[in-house]
C-alpha cells in the first residue's frame, strides 16, 4: 500500500510520529504511516505557493486536460481504489466500486468542463474614458481537509474545483482513512506540475493546525464536524483566510399522510443507512404525520430488519462497520441515551453486533420527541428516529428547529404542498419524494451550523475564485 506523502512532485516518507491505520471490519492494524513533520508541512505549502506563479496563469484548456487525465487514471484504477477504500473504511466493496468510483470520476470530468466556462462580466464603460472588466481569478494556495466517511470522494470534491480555478492545493485526508488519497498522490504526481498538488498525512493537531494556520495559505476548505469547523475558523481568524465549511447535518424527512408509503420505506431503507449512516445528508430524522405514523413505523421497521451487515467483500453485504472503535462507542452511547428516555421504542437494532469489527446493527427508533437528543444531535451511524406530527405548520417549525441546515426531504403527492414546504425549509438542499440524490451539476452545501460554501456545480467553482475589477483608462 502506497504510504508516502506527495510534496513538490516527489513521494517522500513522513518524518513525524507513526500512526496506525486500521481495518474497521476486523479491528486489525493495516499498516503504520509516519506523519508529516512541521518542516514538511511548510515545504508543501511553499511548494504550492511557488507552483501557483505558473499554474495560476495557465489556460483553462491546460487545466481541463490535466483534470481529464486524472479522471481517466482513477477510472483505470477503479478496482484498486475501491479495494483500498473498502479495506480502510469498511465499505462494501461493490458499493465503493459501483457507486463511488463512477461519481468521483464524474466530478473531475465535470470540473474539467467547468474550468472552460468560468468568466467574468463583459467589459463596459461605467466612467467616461474608462473601460471596466470583472475577472474571476484563483486565490493561491488552498488547504483542504477531507473527512473519513468518503475519503476519495471528498478529496475529489475539494481538489477538482480548486485546481480547475487555477489554485494549488495541499490536501490532508483524515488520519483514520488516508489510503486512497495517498494512492491518488502516486498517480497525480506525473499529471500535474510539481507543487500543484501536495498530499500530507497526519493528525489535526500535528499537521492540520500548522497547515491551516500557514501564512501562505489563502483558503481553507473543510468537510468535518462542527467542532473542527469552529476550531479552524478560530485558528485562521488572525490571518483573515477565506474558509469553506461543510460541517454535517441532521436531515429532516417529512412524510405527509398522502405520501407513497412504499416509496418512503424503500427510500429510507436505502438513504438512511447507506455507508452505515455515516453521511451528513442521511435520511435520519423522520417526521411522520399521525395518519400514517403507525403504518410507516411498522413497515419501515420490517424493512430495516432485513438490512444485511457483513464482510465488505461479500456481494450481499449492505452495511459495513463504522469507521473506528471510538465512533462505534459514540453511536452506541447515543442510542443508549435514547433508550433511557423511557418513551423512545427500539423497533429494530439498538445494539452492537457481536464479533470482530466496529459493527452496529441497523436501528430504528420510534416515539422520539422534538427535544430529544436523538432528534437534535447528529449520530452519524445506522440510526433513524421517527417522530409523529399533526400538521404542516408544526412540522415545518420542527424541521427548522435545528442547528443544522444541510439536507431535507418532503414526501407528498400534493404538488402545491411540496413547493410550499420546500420554500420554507432552511436547508441547502430539499428533495421531494426522494432523498440523497446528488449530481455534479447541482450545488451541495448548508446553512446555519452546517456551514457555508458550495461543493460541486459552477457555484462550487466560483467559491475557489476571487472577484477582481480591472479598469483601463483610454
From Swiss-Prot:
Q: Which InterPro entries match?
A: Ald_DH/histidinol_DH (IPR016161), Ald_DH_C (IPR016163), Ald_DH_CS_GLU (IPR029510), Ald_DH_N (IPR016162), Aldehyde_DH_dom (IPR015590), Aminobutyraldehyde_DH (IPR015657), PatD (IPR017749)
Q: Report the biotech usage.
A: Can be used in the industrial production of the value-added compound 5-aminovalerate.
GO BP field: L-lysine catabolic process; protein homotetramerization; putrescine catabolic process
Is Coiled coil a UniProt keyword of this protein?
Answer: no
Q: Which reaction does it catalyse?
A: 4-aminobutanal + NAD(+) + H2O = 4-aminobutanoate + NADH + 2 H(+); 5-aminopentanal + NAD(+) + H2O = 5-aminopentanoate + NADH + 2 H(+)
Q: Which Pfam families match?
A: Aldedh
What does the entry say induces or represses the expression of this protein?
Up-regulated under nitrogen starvation conditions.
* Active-site residues per Swiss-Prot or TrEMBL entry: 246, 280
Instruction: Give the GO cellular component terms, alphabetically.
Output: cytosol; protein-containing complex
Query: Which pathway, per its entry?
Result: Amine and polyamine degradation; putrescine degradation; 4-aminobutanoate from 4-aminobutanal: step 1/1; Amino-acid degradation
Q: What happens when the gene is disrupted?
A: Cells lacking this gene show a high decrease in gamma-aminobutyraldehyde dehydrogenase activity, but are still able to grow with putrescine as the sole nitrogen source. However, a mutant lacking both patD and puuC cannot grow with putrescine as the sole nitrogen source.
Classification via SUPFAM superfamilies: ALDH-like (SSF53720)
Q: What is the similarity comment for this entry?
A: Belongs to the aldehyde dehydrogenase family. Gamma-aminobutyraldehyde dehydrogenase subfamily.
Q: Subunit structure, per the record?
A: Homotetramer.
Tell me the NCBIfam families matching this sequence: ABALDH, PRK13473.1
Q: What is this protein called?
A: Gamma-aminobutyraldehyde dehydrogenase
